[in-house]
């Protein structure tokens, strides 16, 4: 791990062996310009494991790469699980490295969500249980590759999700407004410009292409929401809950037009 307490839960590509550019399969689509089989390096991956077209990914048809977030799983696998080795210099470990990436990513995503919940003062009474869950999941993520591969991530998720939901409820209770529940809703292309959505729940909602310009989204819960192409320009996201960097990158924001 990178600190005495917790691993870094955001991607540090400089310490990773380009795992997300090799392990998963890509299907040619609006998100990827080419087909790529699992375990085959992307043609844009350089010898030093950096992307040759990183600054031009959207323009070159690789928007899927822009919105992907491993939550720090890549560097942990490279530096901790495999002790700084990489699949190019030690080909025999390639299969093992690639196999644990989806497992580690899911574990790190859970750790990230727990850390977000631990930042909520309104959920203080849940903090002991959240810390216990965090420590247990982090210990699982620190296991050897052979053990990691067989990890039942769903069993941990089922125990953590109720805590996260309750933390969200406590945080949103004081948001004011109607606090609409759009959990799991199909809101593709919905027009919600300027709407009062304080404390709303968008957990698992499909917000692809939704117009949320100038909306009041303070303390709204975005856990697992699909924000691809959602227009968030001018929206107030102060205190938004469980909104990941990858979700922000998938949406249209004010920074896209600077």
Model-derived features with residue positions:
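Hydrophobic scaffolds flanking metal-cofactor catalytic centers in soluble metalloenzymes
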Residues: 1-159, 163-174
């Amino acid at each position: 791990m990178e600190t005495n307490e917790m691993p870094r839960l955001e991607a540090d590509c400089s310490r990773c062996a380009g795992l997300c550019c090799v392990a998963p399969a890509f299907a040619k689509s609006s998100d990827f310009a080419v087909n790529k089989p699992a375990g085959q390096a992307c043609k844009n991956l350089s010898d030093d494991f950096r992307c040759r077209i990183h600054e031009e990914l959207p323009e070159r048809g690789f928007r899927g790469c822009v919105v992907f977030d491993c939550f720090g799983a890549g560097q942990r696998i490279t530096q901790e699980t495999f002790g700084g080795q990489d699949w190019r210099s030690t080909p025999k470990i390639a299969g093992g490295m690639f196999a644990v990436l989806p497992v580690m990513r899911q574990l790190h995503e859970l750790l990230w969500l727990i850390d977000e919940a631990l930042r909520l003062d309104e959920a203080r009474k849940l903090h002991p249980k959240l810390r216990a869950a965090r420590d247990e999941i982090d210990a699982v993520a620190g296991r050897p590759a052979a053990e990691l591969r067989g990890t039942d991530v769903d069993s941990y998720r089922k125990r953590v999700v109720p805590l996260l939901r309750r933390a969200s409820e406590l945080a949103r209770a004081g948001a004011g407004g109607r606090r609409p529940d759009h959990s799991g809703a199909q809101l593709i292309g919905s027009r919600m410009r300027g709407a009062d959505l304080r404390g709303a729940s968008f957990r698992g909602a499909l917000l692809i292409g939704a117009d949320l310009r100038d909306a009041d989204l303070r303390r709204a819960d975005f856990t697992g929401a699909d924000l691809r192409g959602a227009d968030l320009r001018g929206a107030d996201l102060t205190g938004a809950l469980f909104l990941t960097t990858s979700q922000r990158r998938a949406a249209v924001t004010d920074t896209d037009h600077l």
